[in-house]
Regions:
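AMP-binding adenylation
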Residues: 1-170
């Protein structure tokens, strides 16, 4: 049931993002995960341009995408958008928890194709510890990720990521 629910939620999120009536379309990429797990969770990549503008208008200081994505006000913004989507979903098929990822999904990292189609198996494998931490109810996770730079070199990035509940999730 969660696999079907995951796909329904993914479609509803895409529809909500396409709805330009929203004051801020804050997500540029998201993946809803739930197959084989107790709840639906979301890994969100914030839209740097839209959220950056929102942050500037609301006095939220940041120096990088990673810093912006982890600001409490941005978690509130994303949580509110997820709660709005949840309000239109059947009981039990709402996103219960989410994380704002410290980076955007990137073709160079193998997470999406060049046409921006998500590679779920790669995301599930790479971000498995985050997904498990969300399902375990943790409030944050120390996450180490390998990254690929535009010049092809690789490096390691350590981040503390906040894990958050979506208000009103059933």
């Amino acid at each position: 049931a969660l696999a079907v629910g995951r796909d329904l939620v993914q479609r509803r999120l895409a529809e909500a993002l396409a709805d330009r009536a929203a004051p801020v379309v804050a997500m540029s990429g998201e993946v809803v995960l739930g197959q084989g797990r107790a709840m639906l969770t979301a890994i969100v990549c914030v839209d740097f341009q839209a959220v950056g503008q929102w942050a500037q208008e609301h006095g939220v200081a940041y120096t990088s995408y990673a810093e912006l994505s982890q600001q409490p006000q941005i978690y509130d913004l994303i949580g509110g958008q997820l709660a709005e989507v949840n309000a239109h979903l059947p009981h039990g098929l709402s996103v219960a928890r989410f994380v704002n990822l410290h980076k955007e999904f990137d073709p160079d990292d193998g997470e999406v194709t060049r046409t921006r189609k998500l590679k779920r198996n790669v995301i599930d494998d790479r971000y498995g510890p985050i997904i498990e931490a969300m399902n375990a109810g943790q409030e944050q996770i120390d996450f180490r990720a390998q990254i690929t730079y535009e010049n092809g070199q690789t490096g390691t990035l350590d981040r503390v990521l906040r894990l958050s509940d979506v208000k009103g999730a059933a």
